Structures are given as structure tokens and as C-alpha cells.
Amino acid sequence: MIQYFKNINQQTVEIDKPEIGTWVNVLPPLKQEEFSELSTGLDIPIDFLTDSLDIDERSRFEEEDNVKLIVIKTPTENNSFNESDAYYITIPICIILTHNQILTVNSFDNPAIKKFLNTFQNRHPDKKNMMVLKVFEKVVQNY
């Protein structure tokens, strides 16, 4: 599922398609066609979008053709928890910065992104560095 958000008249509203200065949030359920459309439409390497699908993906920063990828690991409760499993696991969040948009890609339901979304009012997606810091802040608060 793909959501598009934009700040209009000091309010964050969900819109139907990406525009300049939008936040694009990709969350489960994920479809390969959506990744292909985003990759082509926003000129993003496809592997930047699919890296969040690998639960073992390592935190890192990468840049290709003026598109920046930030992968962070965030702790979350293990939904398949049993006696032999850890209560918490870490899952990747991919943050992709293009010239015109910021994207977050999650392959799992992520409480940190939900908290970020709930406090997103009056944020400006065009201020990408501040948005990245706010995502980091919500990850830390969630842990």
C-alpha cells in the first residue's frame, strides 16, 4: 500500500499521487508492481525500494544518481514470539531522499512510523533533513 502526504495550508493531507514536496509512505501489503511504478515514476533504483524486505538488512547510507538511501533498524515486538524466540526483533526502515520527495518503506507494520504519522501535522515534507531526524526520534522513543 502506498500513501502520499503533503502539507497544504498548514495541514497535512493525504493526496492521490506524488507531487513535489510529498512524503511517500510504503507499507504492507507490498506489491512488486507498486515498487516498479515507484522506481520508474520517481527515478529511484528498484533495490532501494526492495531493501526493506530483507529482515537481515544492515543499517547503512548509500547514494546513487542523487538519490540517498538510509536504512535503519528499529526494534519491535516479535509477533511470532514463543519460548525459544526473542521478545523483540529489529526490522529495517528504508528512508529514501530524492530531489522532490521523501519516501519511507516498511516491510512490517512499524509502530515508530505509526507514531510519526500521528504527529505529522504541520510538518513540511520539503524539509527532508528535519523529517529524517523526526523519524529517528520516533524510533528512539518507541524503543
What kind of region is each of these model predictions?
Residues M1-Y143:
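Peripheral, non-transmembrane regulatory/ligand-interaction domains of membrane transport proteins
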